[in-house]
Amino acid sequence: MHPPLNDCGETELMKKKVALAVGAVLVVGGLGACWYTGNTFDRILAEQIARAQQESGIEVTWSPETENLFTRDGVLKVVVPPQTLASFDPQLAGSEPIEMQFAFNSRLLPLYIKSHLQLDTAQGTLAPILTTLGMQQWQLGAESASSLWTMSNSSRFWVSDFKVKEGLNEFTFLPLNGDYRGDLDGNGHLTAHWLGMTVHDAQSKTDLALADLKGSADMAEISGLWLSPRSDATLTAFSLTQPGNVKITLEGLTTATELVGDDLQTLSTRYQMKVATLNMESEEDRLALTQGNLDLSLKGLDLEGYQTLQEASSKRVDEAAIQEALDKMLQRGATLELADLSARLNGEPVSLQGEAKLAPTTLAQLMGSEEGMQALSGLLHAHLGEKLGQAVPQLAPMLEQFTAMGYLKAQESQLQAELKLDKGAVTVNGLPLHP
């Protein structure tokens, strides 16, 4: 049997009512989520501005132009005052403040924010300079996507290329870009890639070129300080030419740093560097360094002292605060471990390994008295190719003198030295080192 027609109509009507109710709930929920997203955006922006001003000394103000459930548009004004400029270079103490304005546009969806930031080249104190240089189309900007659901952020930033010519002098800046993946507080992974730059100075007859610099770093806030537990960088090539046939070329530079906690009170840092080739030439000399390697660790650093030093350095406070932080670190002592310092100089191998220990002391004692030197102890081993003097003639007189004094010993086709530091006394191959 078929249901009565009026029952069918009531069923369809009920479905429509349910659909309308569900739709209304979704719309209201979406609008509520957008309202919440907008309020959260306002709070996060205010917190980030306050943090930027506190940590950098740069003044940042936000002037909203359009505010509704789905939009936050306005202008970010950034001012670098003379006192902040002077902290980087004392000669800038009396200069005028640098003012920049950025167009800041954000689109709000439920629990999702997409933002775009770009320098307005027609505003601020840089505008006349950029106009004179023909850089009205130059871009300095960033865009980001933030999720309040996962409390995550994905951003990218860029600086476009430009060229400045003045007479026969020329400066070329190639594009730079990077990205960030992490949380809304700034804990995450940052990468950057700069294609490089070239400089030609006709007056000094100097040419400089830097090509393909890449870097990445893990960022983390630890006890209120921004630290990088791990970072790395690579530089493909660098060259510098100056009058007198002076030329320096570098290829294949890589670096890596690591910061780890030993326990609740101490930490260790490790720095590694590799150089494929470094050539230095002049009219008189030529030195080729290949297979360069450095592996250096500092262990047992006082955690509280290290954090205080980082905070003092980042805020560019007076020297007394920095010295106080150094004293805090020195009171615990530390160990320097040189796992490897090696290279080939014009084909001949040279290397240095060992470790040095610093007993608890103070900065004043370490720098200004024999008592501070007594806090140092360690043992280093040097190995030099026996033909180093032939390969690098400018080193030959020194090598001959050290060999005659017993500071270098010929052994197993090498020149070897053992440098021992014991409570301030230095010996080389068991012989006291004379100043």
Task: Kindly give the residue locations of the regions a language model identified.
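Gram-negative bacterial Sec-dependent N-terminal signal peptides
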Residues: L5-A33
